[in-house]
Amino acid sequence: MKVVAFERSVQGTGASRRLRNSGKTPGIIYGGAADPKMIELDHNALWHALKKEAFHSSILDLEVAGKSEKALLRAFQMHPFKPLVLHVDFQRVSANDKIHVKVPLHFMNQETAPGVKLGHGLVNHIVNDLEVSCLPADLPEFIEVDVGNMEVGQTLHLTDLKLPKGVTVVTHGDENPAIASISLPAGAASAAEGEGEGETPAA
């Protein structure tokens, strides 16, 4: 994914405000062997790019003054109530150095899972992304979570996922966290419990 930026020579609160008033967003690219570089980007193009999932979890071709660098989006600051991007940070990446990136999960076959189709349950997304470690070339845009065989009451854990080659998940605390589950809606579960309580054993 290509991102076009321009070098920025002035900095400070006043300069950033004037930049935003002219339809630009201030930013910085850092990391690697090169010095940090102040940049500016077209606000509208950046605004639309931020709406794309891939912009947050893939290696970007960041072009600055005609020179392209591989980079990751690391942070961005939004105005508290206006549709305005105040600042954006990019980090250079090296082909030989592993990176840590949060990758979104795509839940597959939810409608056809037995627990949904036959058991009338609901799929619960316990987590929606995972932090992964990999080389830039191995970074996936997303990780598929296939819930197609799940029943009501079943929980899918990290070890149940098929990870792309070269990708490992970075866990914090729980080494095998729950990813998804299928359960009955609250009303249905209560009704089922009520029916069970109302039953009397046969004489």
From Swiss-Prot:
A GO cellular component annotation here is: cytosolic large ribosomal subunit
Cited InterPro entries: Rbsml_bL25/Gln-tRNA_synth_N, Ribosomal_bL25/Gln-tRNA_synth, Ribosomal_bL25_b-dom, Ribosomal_bL25_C, Ribosomal_bL25_long, Ribosomal_bL25_short, Ribosomal_L25_dom, Ribosomal_uL5_bac-type
Q: Which UniProt keywords apply?
A: Ribonucleoprotein, Ribosomal protein, RNA-binding, rRNA-binding
> Molecular function terms in GO for this entry?
5S rRNA binding; structural constituent of ribosome
Xref: Gene3D superfamilies: Ribosomal protein L25, beta domain (2.170.120.20), Ribosomal Protein L25, Chain P (2.40.240.10)
Q: Where are the transmembrane segments?
A: none
**How is the subunit organization of this protein annotated in UniProt?**
Part of the 50S ribosomal subunit; part of the 5S rRNA/L5/L18/L25 subcomplex. Contacts the 5S rRNA. Binds to the 5S rRNA independently of L5 and L18.
Q: Which family does it belong to?
A: Belongs to the bacterial ribosomal protein bL25 family. CTC subfamily.
Could you tell me what this protein does?
Answer: This is one of the proteins that binds to the 5S RNA in the ribosome where it forms part of the central protuberance.
Q: Which NCBIfam families match?
A: bL25_bact_ctc, PRK05618.1-2, PRK05618.1-5, PRK05943.1
Tell me what this protein is called: Large ribosomal subunit protein bL25
**Organism per entry:** Cupriavidus pinatubonensis (strain JMP 134 / LMG 1197) (Cupriavidus necator (strain JMP 134))
